[in-house]
Amino acid sequence: MSQKFSLFTSHWDPKIVGEVNGHRVKLVKFQGPFVWHRDENEDELFPVHKGRFAMEFRDRRVAVEEGEFIIVPRKTEHRPVAEEEVHVVLFEPATTLNTGDVESELTVGAPERI
């Protein structure tokens, strides 16, 4: 995975690295705050490959360290925030939009395959 992460420098721009049973395996680098959003139909899994970030919810903040993961249940408003660059692996249905129910400058409608 480290080799694949070395192929891009952009933040909040998921890259597709594989597909399994209608789900995509994506790599993404976080840095700074993401947009508040919710995913109506999908739970989200955020395993940390390198670094650390915080998952913010309206009522709490959860630290996620390297080698750990967090699952965000569907319909839960959240946003990841990373003070420093963090490398995250995503496993999601192919139809999942990175900004969920929100359109923003960070929305990636057609992720690049690397």
Provide a role label for each language-model segment.
Residues 1-26, 103-114:
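A short, N-terminal "cap"/entry segment at the start of jelly-roll beta-barrel domains
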Residues 74-103:
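Ligand-binding loop in jelly-roll beta-barrel domains
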Residues 16, 32-36:
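Short, charged beta-strand/loop "edge" motif centered at a coil->beta-strand transition
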Residues 29-31, 39-57:
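Short, conserved beta-strand element in jelly-roll/cupin
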Residues 58-76:
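Short acidic-glycine-tyrosine-enriched beta hairpin
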Residues 21, 49-50, 65-66, 84:
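A cytosolic small-molecule/anion-sensing beta-strand core signal
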Residues 22-24, 31-33, 51-54, 61, ...:
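Short, charged/polar surface micro-motifs in flexible loops or helix N-caps
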Residues 37-39, 78:
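Histidine-centered active-site/metal-ligand motif
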